[in-house]
Amino acid sequence: MEKTDPPNHGAVCEAAAMAVVRLLTDPRAAESDGEWRAAVREWESRRIRKVTRRARGVRWPEAEKLPGVTVAHEGAEVRAFVPTAVSDVPPELARLQVAGLDLEEGEPGPRPEPPYAAIALNPDVTMTTGKAAAQCGHAAQLLLRQGRRRHVAAWIEGGARVRLARDVPWRDCVKRATAVVRDGGFTEVPPGTMTAIAWLPR
């Protein structure tokens, strides 16, 4: 992400959610003999944690050489990497900045026709863009695993699109939620905070 023309907050959050889902549904992760399958299963069997890092200049093409899936969306480029233990993060990622990614909110795009995933961030919880993007990725992952199978299949077949639900009152979002993220409390918010929710509008 370059300083001169940064993407907006919402675009990064939506791209992060789509990148996570597309990585998890990639044949290399989803099929029994896929080369990413073991790493994903090990990660999902434990307490899931996601870390958002910012890459600029030559750091971005260096990072893109690592296994993962990149999503370009409304000016944002986000890459979800095959999960590893925190102690095993490749040096190409370890050198990237973690904290301090906080972008301006942009105008939301038009609401797409279903199938798409709606993700709402808790308006009573203050989070940086990096934190919010991680929460959106987690919400999309939970929706992928917990949603009704046929509805999830249609969403994936339609490109796994994601839209932040910024025009729906939070209490109404909570009523619609299929997936709820309660943060582990490692950064920015107390443990157990409800940070994001997701559902598949019909």
Predicted regions and their residues:
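Positively charged, small/polar-rich N-terminal and surface patches that mediate targeting and assembly
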Residues: 1-162, 167-174, 183-202
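Active-site regions of enzymes building and remodeling cell-envelope glycoconjugates
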Residues: 177-178
